[in-house]
């Protein structure tokens, strides 16, 4: 009887061992893939500004010849509507600075009367972006007609176009480029940067970058960069004389570049037309106590050193 029970135990034990041996072993690769998948799930998704520029739908009179006016306005269409809205308004502001049109009267301009039927398809469209741009296009065409009436052979042109410059990170940037020639001695150009926080969905201004009570320190650093620029560009024998005509001022038009904070200036802001669109660069190593930590470049992690084999002894 005891022998029979012992035999039964041995049989059951042998069966359990056999079944365990038949189970498939876990593939190490599968385990590694699961670990990678877990890490990827835990890593936060970085927000990215994606978009394209699309031309504004304006109507211009038919024109043939080499002196036809060129009017091009493009707008940003992105995955962040709050940015599109801000850029749209800045485009309209830029057009107003270039053309400086007044509010249209009841009759409208000559060009407006010619294209009214095809450009505006009802009163409900008057406040749309394209309808507002059309007003500036009408003023632009009227200017062209006036110049041609004076027997001018000038070909006037106007371009306003945004571009995504920095799509990821703490600060994303859209640049708005504009250029125009309206029949004067020379053309004009401008470059404005608009910076945004995608997480908070807000525009970032220069003062947002600064630590408390550090604006004066930034102005001092920018003024030193200005002095260096004046002398390096050979604009004057000394900075004091130069500032009699072109005094320094701090620009609010900025870009966080790879090497430092870039302050962008427009034509005639800190120099004559010949200097174009000057910019001052303040290196990040000078801004450690001026900019908030989140706006400074993060130090790159040092690669792990390779193990060194030692001989036994």
Residue ranges and their predicted role:
Residues 2-11:
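Bacterial N-terminal signal peptides that target proteins for export
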Residues 18-21:
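C-terminal motif of bacterial Sec signal peptides marking the signal peptidase cleavage site
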Residues 23-313:
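Compositionally biased intrinsically disordered regions enriched in Thr/Gly
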């Amino acid at each position: 009887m005891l022998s029979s029970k012992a035999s039964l135990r041995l049989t059951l034990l042998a069966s359990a061992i056999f079944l365990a041996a038949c189970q498939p072993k876990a593939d190490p690769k599968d385990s590694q893939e699961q670990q990678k998948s877990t890490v990827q799930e835990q890593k936060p998704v970085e927000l990215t500004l994606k978009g394209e520029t699309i031309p504004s739908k304006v109507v211009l009179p038919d024109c043939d010849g080499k002196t036809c006016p060129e009017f091009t306005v493009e707008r940003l269409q992105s995955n962040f509507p709050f940015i599109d809205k801000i850029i749209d308004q800045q485009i309209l502001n830029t057009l107003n600075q270039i053309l400086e049109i007044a509010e249209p009267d009841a009759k409208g301009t000559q060009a407006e009367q010619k294209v009214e039927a095809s450009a505006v398809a009802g009163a409900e469209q008057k406040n749309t972006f394209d309808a507002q741009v059309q007003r500036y296009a009408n003023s632009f065409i009227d200017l062209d007609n006036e110049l041609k009436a004076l027997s001018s052979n000038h070909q006037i042109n106007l371009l306003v176009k945004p571009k995504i410059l920095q799509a990821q990170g703490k600060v994303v940037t859209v640049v708005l480029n504009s250029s125009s020639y309206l029949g004067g001695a020379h053309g004009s150009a401008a470059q404005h940067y608009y910076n945004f926080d995608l997480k908070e969905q807000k525009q970032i201004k220069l003062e947002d970058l600064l630590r408390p009570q550090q604006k004066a320190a930034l102005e001092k650093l920018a003024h030193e960069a200005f002095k260096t620029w004046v002398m390096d560009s050979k604009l004057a024998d000394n900075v004091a004389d130069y500032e009699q005509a072109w005094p320094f001022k701090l620009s609010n038009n900025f870009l966080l570049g790879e090497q430092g904070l870039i302050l962008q200036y427009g034509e005639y802001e800190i120099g004559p037309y010949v200097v174009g669109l000057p910019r001052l660069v303040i290196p990040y190593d000078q801004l450690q106590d001026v900019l908030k930590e989140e706006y400074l470049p993060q130090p790159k992690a040092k690669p792990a050193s390779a193990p060194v084999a030692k001989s036994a002894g």
